[in-house]
Amino acid sequence: MSIWTELIVDKFLYGRPTHRLLQSWKGLGLDVSAGTVAGGFAHLAPMFAPLMQAFLDRQHLDSHWHADETGWKVFERVDGKKTNRWYLWVYRSNSAIYFDLEPSRAAAVPEAHFKGLSEGIVICDRYSAYKKMARTLGFLLAFCWAHVRRDFLTLAQGYPQLEAWSLAWVERIGILYHLNKVRLAVQGDGVAFARDTASVERHLQSMSAHCDLALQDKALHEAARKVMTSLRHHWHGLSVFMAHPDIALDNNSAENAVRGPVVGRKNYYGSGSIWSAQFTASMFTVLLTLD
């Protein structure tokens, strides 16, 4: 059993291709074929189904979740699908980090994950699938301020004439993070929390006013207008954290969770079959939840 434990941890937690571990074992006198490993994984895969269901059931008891998705390769032909591009979805909450490998990036995927729930908050980027899911399920979306910050940094890097203007917005966002951190530090003190919440609210109102003024400026650069239009359009979701202090300002939690799997994707190129893709998602879920 220790051999299988090492194989699973080495590949799915540390992201190392299995053949490298097998080569190192062979140098120590232990010759295990890749076919033996694949057959063993196929035998083990169904054993984790009850555990995956338990993780899902437990996660459904939470009130909010971080969600993200990234590309993945699955090298088994699927009827009706022209490419081998699949998607690794991650849902992170206080109780679990749940991974799901699916052939689609459509809203139907997160809708299926949250099936049976009638309310909740999903912290996510501005991808349209989450918006459709929220409308279908009646969920609330909390959008990511880190993505907004990146919008302004991209402007600063791509348009020298907008650098000072863009970095002023980056500074405003930094102040927002600081003020929110200060208010969260005094949650146990009702008076101090109310005072610091008012400070955050005033800063948000100031940012909102700056946004409106920029959009009223007919001379505003088109690239800057696009960023400001998005900011205004997503403002409600970017403000959810005010009424829900347990909601983070960004989706870094989900993005951090998927970093290890992304390293694995680069090292072993994806999954050779559908069952191995499902096993991969199970192993990511178990190992990263328990890590």
Where are these regions (language model features)?
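Catalytic center-proximal scaffold of phosphoryl-transfer enzymes
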Residues: 1-291
